Design a protein with these regions (language model features):
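Short, well-ordered beta-strand segments in soluble/periplasmic domains
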Residues: 40-44, 55-58
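Short, surface-exposed secondary-structure edge patches
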Residues: 8, 43-49, 78
Length: 118
């Protein structure tokens, strides 16, 4: 993975996410491991090489419409002793509506974290 080039804080959260590979078509349903304004880390039973274009459907709250985001893999690694991969996915295109929803959600997490450490 190399040096940490993250520009925004990440939060350890576990949310359902669907990864749609555009070419060739493939669908993986999994969970996030962490989330930031710029991307997500998740697990996958399928490998997605670096620069694979993906469409993500990310559910932040049960019963809410998922965020639909375009992204691409920036790294992947094999999970030791398993048949899974960890994926790092950077968001490419986020609508203004979904940016607002993601920003509100991450701000809430940040405030909760700050208040719990006092």
């Amino acid at each position: 993975m190399g040096a940490d080039r993250r520009r925004t804080p990440r939060f350890r959260v576990y949310h359902p996410v669907r990864l749609h590979r555009l070419r060739p078509t493939q669908l993986v349903e999994t969970l996030t491991k962490d989330l930031s304004f710029g991307g997500v880390r998740c697990m996958s039973t399928a490998t997605f090489p670096i620069s694979t274009e993906l469409q993500l459907e990310l559910v932040l709250f049960a019963g809410e419409e998922p965020l639909t985001l375009a992204g691409h893999t920036v790294w992947f690694q094999v999970v030791p002793y398993g048949e899974q991969y960890e994926l790092g996915i950077a968001f490419d295109e986020v609508s203004a509506h979904h940016k607002r929803r993601l920003s509100i959600y991450l701000d809430t997490l940040s405030r909760q974290l700050a208040s719990s450490s006092v």
